[in-house]
Amino acid sequence: MTASKRLIRGVSGASLFLFSCAVFAHFPLMQCWSTGALIECEAGYSDGSKAVDYQVRMFDYDDNLIAKVQTDKRSIATFSKSADDFYIIFDSGHESPVEVDSVEISEK
């Protein structure tokens, strides 16, 4: 095999490895539910890992911060239920933040 063919194969293999890593990336997920006077949200990642000690924020529809809490050791963030419409955001710092609107939250 000539040196140029080996170089092309080496570059092709390295490119395939680098670009295939993106396939294995994980993205943030969050599911929220209502339990009486509380809203609970479980934050995590698509690979099944938990999001422990991450900030989760609640905003009203005018984008005013209502509350911010940290996820616990179970990846659960707990809020007091707001009388107004709201949305909750989990921003893990990479990929896109996850947003759950109050109309999407049902009783557990």
Regions of interest found by a model, annotated:
Residues 16-24:
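C-terminal segment of classical bacterial N-terminal signal peptides
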Residues 84-96:
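Short, aromatic- and glycine-rich surface loops/edge beta-strands on solvent-exposed regions
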